[in-house]
């Protein structure tokens, strides 16, 4: 594995949030000027390689991998299909965690679920059910997420306060946080659907 592959792998897993030169330097141990050179090389490689669907962009202080604009029509078909289809169990689980714990970071969601949530969270942002509501004042300035008005419309809620109150869970409970969020969330959504 070469140095640029390490940087590329970090860009990939950073997803839509992107990653800063400082973070790339911290994770890889390479100096910032070396990181900038690698990013420049990657950007040029993506530009000249007609067989890749990706390109590297910089927005603000972060770098991210995105799809090339000429692929927009095929991606619109994909996301249009997904927007009409139901939500996966993972998407419902993430939505319920965001709804009850907002504002919340992706890392906090991952910790509650015990698995990586980046791709599903990104799809929820694209579907306008979740949005970035701010950034934490800590290293890396991670984004915080919250629900949208579209989320309320999608589930027939007038206000986020209409979600059911979570029961207190004792230490001896078999339910973990993510199970509890999802159970309560689904119970509320089933109730709403029966009333329609």
UniProtKB/Swiss-Prot annotation:
Q: What is its main location?
A: cytoplasm
Q: Where in the cell is it found?
A: Cytoplasm
**Which cellular components does GO assign to this protein?**
cytoplasm
InterPro entries, alphabetically? Answer: ScpB_csome_segregation, WH-like_DNA-bd_sf, WH_DNA-bd_sf
GO biological-process terms attached to the record: cell division; chromosome separation; DNA replication
List keywords of the entry alphabetically: Cell cycle, Cell division, Chromosome partition, Cytoplasm
Per the record, the domain of life is Bacteria
Disulfide topology: none
Entry's Gene3D superfamilies?
A: Winged helix-like DNA-binding domain superfamily/Winged helix DNA-binding domain
- Pfam families for the chain: SMC_ScpB
Q: How does it assemble?
A: Homodimer. Homodimerization may be required to stabilize the binding of ScpA to the Smc head domains. Component of a cohesin-like complex composed of ScpA, ScpB and the Smc homodimer, in which ScpA and ScpB bind to the head domain of Smc. The presence of the three proteins is required for the association of the complex with DNA.
Task: Fetch the HAMAP family from UniProt.
Answer: ScpB (MF_01804)
Its biological purpose is as follows: Participates in chromosomal partition during cell division. May act via the formation of a condensin-like complex containing Smc and ScpA that pull DNA away from mid-cell into both cell halves.
**Record-stated family:** Belongs to the ScpB family.
> What's this protein's name?
Segregation and condensation protein B
- Species this chain originates from: Pediococcus pentosaceus (strain ATCC 25745 / CCUG 21536 / LMG 10740 / 183-1w)
